[in-house]
Design a protein with these regions (language model features):
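Signature for HUH/AEP ssDNA processing cores
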Residues: 97-170, 181-189, 325-328
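Short secondary-structure junctions
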Residues: 47-49, 158-164, 205, 361-367
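Acidic/polar low-complexity segments and flexible, solvent-exposed patches
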Residues: 308-435
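A short beta-strand motif that forms the metal-chelation/ATP-contact edge
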Residues: 176-182, 221-225, 383-389
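Polyanion/phosphate-binding surface patch
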Residues: 51-84
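A short linear hydrophobic-aromatic micro-motif
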Residues: 162-167, 208-210, 368-373
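C-terminal accessory nucleic-acid interaction domains of nucleic acid-metabolism proteins
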Residues: 1-29, 35, 46, 50-51, ...
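Short beta-strand
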Residues: 56-59, 165-171, 211-215
Length: 435
C-alpha cells in the first residue's frame, strides 16, 4: 500500500500522504477519496470558498476522532498556496489560507480538512463582506419540513427587500441561505441586517422560528444572526461535513427544497449531481444587492424597542446591547438548568448524560428533545462539548439538584498549558549571576 500518492492538478503536483487512511469509517472513504471529491467539484467549491481566507478544520483521525481549528497557515506549504493576514476581535492576528484553484483544494484535503470554512470577505478587502449568511439551525426534535417552512418565509423577506437568496443544505440538520451583497458595509452592519431578517421571520411565524440567542430560550428553528459577526465562518457550498455518512452542503433550487432529503447529498453522490446540473450557485455574483432596506427595517425595529441582541461571548460589548454577565459570575438563567458534564470528546459527554438519565429516570421521562442542550465550547485548539439539561418540563418535586460534573474535563487546562509554554519561552535559559 502506497504511503503517498501524487495528483497532477493543472500542472501542479499535489502529494497526498497516507492516501488510504480511512476518514469515514461507516462508508470506508479515504483521504484520497476526499481529495478526488474536491477535484471533481472544484469550480463549484471555489465559487463558495475560493479567493477568501479560510479556517482549516482538520480531522487527522477522521470522523469520530479529535479535530481542531487551525487559523494560521502551516509554515511548510507550497509556494503557490496564498495567505492573507487577518485581525480578529480578540486582538490576535493570523495568516490564513486563500485557495485560488483546484490544486489548493486538494492540498487542503491532504491536511484532512474535511470542511471548507471561508470568511464572508474577499482577500482583497477584509473589512467589507460580500456575503450575508442566514443560518437556519433547528433545535433537537425539529425536522426538515419545519426548516423548509421557515426557509420559505426567509425567501419572502429577502424578496421584499430586493435581495436574492441562494439556499443550500448545511450538510448537517439545517439549511443556509446565502446572499451576495455589495461590498459597502461593515461586519457589524451585515450582522444587524441579518438580525433584522431573523426578527422579521420570527414575527411572522413565532411558533416556528426564533432569534433567541440563549439555547434554553429557543424553540423551532433558530436563525443564527451571529454567524455574520467578524471571525465567524460557515461551511460553504459543496463542503464535506463530519457526519458518519459523509454528507455535503448541497446547493439547491428553491423549487426542489420541498421534495429533497439532505441525507441524499454525500461525498459519494454529489459528483454525479454536479456533473448533471453544474453549480446551482454559479450566477450568484451577478446578483449583488443592497442592504439599505434591511438596515431601514432594523432601524424601525429599534424604534419599536428592539435593541441589539447578544453577541458571542468573546466579543467586546456593543452600544445598545443589554448587560452582559461579568466573567466572575454566572448569568441568571430564565429556566431551571443544570449542567451534566463537559469533555473533549462529544461521545464522552453524551455518555455522562446517559448515566445521569439512569440515576434520575423519573425526571428523564419528562424531558423533551429540545431540553437536552449540547454546546460546543471553543478551546485553544479544538471544540469541547458541554451537556446541560433544561428541567422546565420536569415537575418541581422531581427535579434533581446540581451534581458534580460527569465527566469533568477542564478545557481551561488547554489554555493554561499554552500560557505555561509561553512563560517558559520568556524565561532566560541561564540564570543571572548574583551581583
Amino acid at each position: 500500500m502506497s504511503e503517498q500518492e501524487t495528483l497532477e492538478v493543472a500542472g501542479r503536483a499535489v502529494s497526498v500522504s497516507n492516501p488510504h487512511k480511512v476518514l469515514f469509517p461507516q462508508t470506508g472513504q479515504t483521504k484520497l477519496d476526499l481529495a478526488r471529491y474536491y477535484l471533481a467539484i472544484a469550480e463549484g467549491a471555489l465559487q463558495g470558498a475560493g479567493h477568501r481566507p479560510n479556517v482549516l478544520v482538520r480531522y487527522p483521525d477522521g470522523v469520530g476522532g479529535e479535530f481542531f481549528y487551525q487559523k494560521r497557515a502551516p509554515r511548510s506549504r507550497p509556494e503557490w498556496i496564498e495567505v492573507v493576514s487577518l485581525q480578529f476581535p480578540s486582538g490576535r492576528s493570523a495568516e490564513e489560507i486563500v485557495p485560488r484553484d483546484a490544486a489548493a483544494l486538494a492540498w487542503m484535503a491532504n491536511l484532512a480538512c474535511l470542511e471548507l470554512h471561508p470568511h464572508p470577505v474577499r482577500a482583497d478587502d477584509l473589512d467589507h463582506p460580500d456575503e450575508l449568511r442566514v443560518d437556519l439551525d433547528p433545535v433537537p426534535g425539529v425536522d426538515w419540513p419545519q426548516i423548509r417552512e421557515v426557509s420559505a418565509i426567509v425567501k419572502a423577506v429577502l424578496d421584499e427587500v430586493g435581495l436574492t437568496g441562494w439556499p443550500k443544505t448545511s450538510g448537517s440538520r439545517g439549511m443556509h441561505v446565502f446572499v451576495r451583497i455589495q461590498r459597502r458595509w461593515t461586519f457589524d452592519q451585515v450582522r444587524r441586517a441579518v438580525l433584522a431578517v431573523a426578527r422579521e421571520v420570527e414575527r411572522r411565524t413565532p411558533t416556528l422560528a426564533t432569534s433567541k440567542w440563549w439555547k434554553e430560550e429557543r424553540h423551532g428553528v433558530f436563525i443564527d444572526y451571529n454567524q455574520n459577526a467578524k471571525d465567524r465562518t460557515v461551511a460553504s457550498a459543496y463542503s464535506v461535513r463530519p457526519t458518519a455518512d459523509a454528507r455535503v452542503s448541497a446547493p439547491l433550487t428553491w423549487e426542489e427544497i420541498a421534495d429533497c432529503n439532505p441525507a441524499d447529498f454525500t461525498l459519494a453522490t454529489m459528483p454525479a449531481r454536479y456533473a448533471r446540473l453544474g453549480d446551482l450557485h454559479r450566477d450568484m455574483d451577478r446578483h449583488a444587492g443592497s442592504l439599505d432596506a434591511l438596515l431601514e427595517l432594523s432601524a424601525r425595529q429599534q424604534a419599536d424597542g428592539l435593541g441589539d441582541a447578544p453577541w458571542p461571548p468573546h466579543y467586546r460589548k456593543q452600544p445598545g446591547e443589554a448587560s452582559r454577565v461579568a466573567p466572575s459570575r454566572r448569568r441568571m438563567p430564565k429556566h431551571p438548568l443544570i449542567e451534566i458534564g463537559r469533555a473533549r470528546e462529544k461521545a464522552d459527554a453524551l455518555a455522562g448524560l446517559e448515566r445521569w438519565k439512569a440515576r434520575h429516570s423519573a425526571a428523564a421521562a419528562h424531558l423533551e428533545p429540545a431540553d437536552i442542550l449540547v454546546d460546543g465550547l471553543r478551546g485553544r485548539f479544538r471544540t469541547w462539548t458541554r451537556v446541560r439539561v433544561n428541567l422546565q418540563h420536569v415537575p418541581p418535586e422531581l427535579r434533581p439538584v446540581q451534581e458534580p460534573l460527569d465527566p469533568d474535563e477542564n478545557m481551561h487546562d488547554e489554555w493554561r498549558a499554552v500560557s505555561d509554554r509561553s512563560a517558559r519561552r520568556r524565561t532566560p535559559s541561564r540564570a543571572r549571576k548574583a551581583p
